[in-house]
Amino acid sequence: MRAQIEPDFERARKIYDEILEQILAYTDYCDEFGDEDGEEYRKVEERLAKISGKDMSKFSLHEWWEAEGAENLAFDIALPEPKVVPDITKDELSVIVERMLAPVPKFDDDFLEAFYIRVEFACRGAYFAEFLKLNFADTFSFELFERREIEGVMRELSANEIVEILWGKRG
């Protein structure tokens, strides 16, 4: 698949440690001094936006410990956002959907082993789900990847069925 479609793990890997360090330092700061006025939060948010190039408003630095942990938050911030790819092919769409439905592969690379599921899983914020939402706005729905009753049977849609729905009137 083309590089402009794939998640940019190398960029994420380069800035991950710095982002994680900022998140943990902010937590330590709050534990010691508090941040009732949010001044330190805004400073950290600005630094993270500068490092990642992302709009930080969709991330919560306050309560990551109640969510998925600092490491996952740091990865989500570090991984570049998906891009609009107007000339995506149906074959490329099929590869994406098949990856999203397949079990997570095993990696020898610890970074990929830890975080690949975060790009593949069919949920809000996951890289490929967000890629589909961006590039197939008229036909994408998270529900495409959920079990449903079809002709009286509870099942998931197949990869081909999902691709046909997403591809819609394009083809």
Short names for language-model regions:
Residues 1-4, 22, 71-78, 110, ...:
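A generic structural signal for ordered alpha-helices
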Residues 80-82:
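Aromatic- and Gly/Pro-enriched, solvent-exposed loop/edge beta-strand patches characteristic
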Residues 7, 96-105:
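N-terminal acidic leader/helix
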Residues 105-115:
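Short amphipathic N-terminal alpha-helix
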Residues 16, 20, 41-44, 90-93, ...:
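Short amphipathic alpha-helical segments that mediate assembly, nucleic-acid/protein binding
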Residues 28, 32-76, 114-171:
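Compact alpha-helical subdomains of small soluble proteins
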Residues 1-42:
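N-terminal leader regions
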